[in-house]
Amino acid sequence: GWLAWKRAPLPPRSALAPLAMVAVGCIIGFPWLTSIAMRSLPAAHGAVLVGILPLATAVFGALLAGEKPSAGFWIMASVGSALVIGFALGQSGGSLQPADLAIFLAVLLAAMGYAAGGRLSQTLGGQQTICWALLLSAPVLLPLVGWLCWQDAPRLAAAGAAAWTGFAYVSVFSMFIGFFFWYRGMALGGVARVGQVQLVQPFLSLLGAALVLGEALAWPTVVFAIAVIAVVGAGRKMQVKRAENRRLS
């Protein structure tokens, strides 16, 4: 729909491999593996995922996008990830479970998709990058979704308004419109540098839960949040050399 509305041209052949990485990493692999893992893991493990993902994104930014972060950047990224992981493990009692393997694989796939999409957005644009990746994944997802809807028809019929509202939000914003801004930011600021913003996400989620749901906001959460924000701010000042932008053909 968006591609037709904008009359976007077909992507060049050289864009197919990065688009496939986005499709496999961000559209199929990451949501599928995390949904499997979080069935048996406590919610705090989701913060572990977010804590590892920025560092993994920086690694793939170096591998796929040709970026060269300085030693200072790697130190700040590692410290930030360690803070978030330590906070999450402290909330969950410090235990790891077999389903954490799915979390680890999800992190690798998402980091690959972020880096490939961020690099591609420099020439294709953030909107076209996610739209073409969604279209590329459609032949795999449509039959699978149709089969799942047929299998779970009674559950779908019994789902309430809150469930459908959450599903619509994730579908429209998290998996579509959000990527417009995410890939645009990576195209402007670089994969490694912009990816570090994810470190603040767990604490913003806890703040939102406190404001919207009335959940208690403990003082260790505030301390960790301030420390992570300070690390992200310091990391933004560290040098990251970016590869020259080459047009796709």
Where in this protein do the model-derived segments appear?
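Transmembrane alpha-helical segments that form core, pore/gating elements
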Residues: 3-4, 57-58, 77, 94-152, ...
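Hydrophobic/aromatic residues within transmembrane alpha-helices
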Residues: 37, 63-65, 69, 120, ...
